[in-house]
UniProtKB/Swiss-Prot annotation:
Species name: Sulfurovum sp. (strain NBC37-1)
Enzyme class (EC, first level): transferase
E.C. code: 2.1.3.-
Gene Ontology terms describing biological process: tRNA wobble uridine modification
Molecular function in Gene Ontology: carboxyl- or carbamoyltransferase activity; S-adenosyl-L-methionine binding
Protein name as catalogued: Carboxy-S-adenosyl-L-methionine synthase
Entry keyword set: S-adenosyl-L-methionine, Transferase
Amino acid sequence: MKDKVFEKPIEKKFEFDQAVASVFDDMLSRSVPFYDEVRHLVISLILAEQREGMKVLDLGASTAKFLLDLHSKMEAGMQLKGIDNSPAMLERAEQKCQAFGASIDLALADMMEYSYEEEDIIVANYTLQFIRPMQRIELVKRLYESLNEGGMFIFSEKVVFEDKRLDKEMIDIYYDYKKTQGYSEYEIAQKREALENVLIPFTIEENIRMCRDAGFRNISTIFQWANFVTFVAKK
């Protein structure tokens, strides 16, 4: 279904409700530059590490698109889990997993309150940016503690730049990109207003520092397009 959420005047801040869940896959593919390519990149990285019984947790699993893609490509019997705090998203995720016959453990949970078990890989695709900065830092510390030695935390984020002129230029370039994906200036402005104080991005340096302060020692960026970046932090 095509994303038309912001064609009408907004009445509330952005949230992952039924209206968003129904068009979320389209929203991601048209709103996040190279979303499909990054998803495939992260899956390839996980598959390079795959082994029987390896545990993979997706934070903010939404409609389970990432986990289903990973499930369809894996050869070893990995244990796939996903959590999301949106009932509407989880409902769609469960429907899709059932339709594809995929054995994926899904849970309705808040990332800040979830009881993390030992994991080998944790993935967060454009998820941390919706968590308040101080809570975000505490969450990453908990993720580090839950990872087994040698484990990986792979996350993608929208970022800001300390250079204000460069930051504005990157935002303008991104909005031009959205226009090429069929979004009108009105829709772009509506979504920008809805996300105000909901999506709070860090700089690249702040994301790296957050991981380092949590205990990660090997932190790399493996993809960047303008103000969209994918990081890998190893324990």
